[in-house]
């Protein structure tokens, strides 16, 4: 749904050494959600949330 937002981030390791950071565990309502996810340059890469939203979910789904 367009109102979905992200509560977790996942690092996709299918194409090393490049890593795609995507949202996981999306819910229709989440009090503290991720609007964006980024991968760190650590080894192994870690996926973390950026641009946190409070209260309402983002109007567009996290990609």
Curated annotation (Swiss-Prot):
Hey, where's the site called Reactive bond for trypsin on this chain?
Answer: 13-14, 41-42
Under InterPro entries, the record lists:
Bowman-Birk_prot_inh (IPR035995), Prot_inh_BBI (IPR000877)
Q: Reply yes or no: does the keyword Disulfide bond apply.
A: yes
* Entry superkingdom: Eukaryota
Which Pfam families does the UniProt record give? Bowman-Birk_leg
Q: Which GO terms describe its cellular component?
A: extracellular region
List the SUPFAM superfamilies hit by this protein, alphabetically.
Bowman-Birk inhibitor, BBI (SSF57247)
Q: Which Cys residues form disulphide pairs?
A: 5-62, 6-23, 9-57, 11-21, 30-37, 34-49, 39-47
GO MF, one annotated term: serine-type endopeptidase inhibitor activity
For this UniProt record, the keywords arranged alphabetically read as follows: Disulfide bond, Protease inhibitor, Serine protease inhibitor
Q: What family name appears in the similarity comment?
A: Belongs to the Bowman-Birk serine protease inhibitor family.
Query: What's the miscellaneous note?
Result: One of the interaction site with trypsin probably also interacts with chymotrypsin.
This one is known as Bowman-Birk type proteinase inhibitor B-II
Q: Which organism is it from?
A: Arachis hypogaea
Classification lineage = Eukaryota, Viridiplantae, Streptophyta, Embryophyta, Tracheophyta
